[in-house]
Amino acid sequence: RDRSVSRGLGDVYKRQSYNSAELGKKLYKEEYGEKDIYIFNSRSASVGETLIAMKIQECEDSGMSFQEVIDTVEQYIAGQNTYFVLENLDTLRKNGRLTGIKAIVASALNIKPVMGAKPEGIICQLGQARGMKRALAKMADHIIEDLENPKEKILAISHCNCEERALEVQRMLLEKINVRSSFIIDTAGISTM
């Protein structure tokens, strides 16, 4: 089929990614002519974008029209949730979300922030805990509390060189919820699809 469906990262990179996607769309059309191309705002990153790509493929495989794919995937994106725990607070300190003093104190106390994304893709702190094990348990509690229609959902977990933690989070969640399917993927450094 002569059509493409894509989008960059969430709101943090929205303008740059959107402009790059629009430029790519324009260049493609200049070279190959008019095609159906739609740019999604994934409001996610990493495994969230992987899930979106899987949903697009599922829609394509089922024979949906271009507009049906767009509508279905937009609805799918709106129902996605992203959660994560930070190993250290350097990123929050460097981007100004946490002062240097607070980062030092939190690090000394082994405080791990539990983070998530709002529906519009904005990252926010959902809670915190002392130690990684407690933080992961708190994250799992947030996931379970926020989850709607679990039997329709795919639980996708990404990790960066920490498969044991990913498996533990998967175990904690699958003991309490019944999802359509579940998988774990490894990422490396800054990760997008």
Which residue ranges define each predicted feature?
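Mixed-charge interfacial surface used for oligomerization/domain docking
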Residues: S17-L27, Y32-Y38, S44-M54, E58-T192
